[in-house]
Structures are given as structure tokens and as C-alpha cells.
């Protein structure tokens, strides 16, 4: 995982050049937006258990057969695994949002995710729906339009940051498809 600074330095070093021009301007923007980024990640972390449980509950409400005796969330163990998996996905999305880089999400969470679920017989559609619910909730927190927040959320125009977070969730959904 390379953060924004490491990516710029690595790129400049590979060219045997100084950091400057557009790279320097991009870093200046990254720093100036830093407090919004930190506030957004803090909003996700502070509300993580609610985000995850609401997403899994929403998935089950839309597909009650998941908790029937033959359903994928029927036993406590399976429900706990579902909640755990959603929490892991949300955690890696928050890491990506913090660093401004999706490589940690792709390398440590998404690589082989579809194959793992397929081998366990876990339907991708339900997981994708839970990810979609988490995406909507996180975007609402970042845009300060959620009515369920525990702490203050980022102030000012955070639409670019919300779009970035949505993109990370879209990567997860694509990996499940």
C-alpha cells in the first residue's frame, strides 16, 4: 500500500527527478483536504457497528430466506461470519479512504474474495446488496446527510470524498460479481 506521498516520491525517484509541478499540486490538495478525510474516516469508524449491522439486516429483510433453516445466515455461527466479513470490507474501505489509495483493499480484501465465497457456497447477490447498503450509509455520513450519526461528520463540500468512498465500494461489488 502506498499513500499519496509515497506514490509521488516513488514515481519521481523512478524518473530520477524532483517532486514538483502537478505532483506537488496534487499533494498540496491532498493535505488541504486532509481534515475532511480524517473526519470521514472517523465517522465511518465511530459508526462501524451500526453500518455493518444495518447492512446485514437490510440484506436479510430483502431476502428473508437467508435466515431460514437452509439459509446462509441461519445459524449464529453463519450470522457472525456474515457480520465479520462485512466489517472486514468496511475496515479496508476505511483504510483506502484514509490513504487515498485502493491497493490495500484490492490486495488484502478483494483478491480471491469471489472465489472464496463461491467455494463456501455463499451467494454473491446478498453480499453485493449488503455492500450497496454500506456504500449508501457511508456516503450519507460523509455528505452529512445521515440522521443516525454518533459524532460530528465532515463539514464543507465533501462530494469528492464521498465519490471516492463510493468508488471503493464499487470495487468490492465488482469483485463479488
Curated annotation (Swiss-Prot):
Contains two phycocyanobilin chromophores, one mesobiliverdin chromophore and one 15,16-dihydrobiliverdin chromophore with binding mediated by both the alpha and beta subunits. (2R,3E)-phycocyanobilin 1 binds at residues 28, 35, 39, 154, 156, 158. (2R,3E)-phycocyanobilin 2 binds at residues 77, 82, 84-85. The keyword Thylakoid applies. InterPro entries: Globin-like_sf, Phycobilisome_asu/bsu, Phycobilisome_asu/bsu_sf. SUPFAM superfamilies: Globin-like. The light-harvesting system in Cryptophytes contains phycobiliprotein complexes. Unusually they are composed of either phycoerythrin (CPE) or phycocyanin (CPC) but never allophycocyanin (APC), with only one type of biliprotein being present in any one species. Unlike cyanobacteria or red algae these proteins are not arranged into higher-order phycobilisome complexes, and they are found in the thylakoid lumen. Light-harvesting photosynthetic tetrapyrrole chromophore-protein from the phycobiliprotein complex. This is Phycocyanin-645 beta chain. It comes from Chroomonas sp.
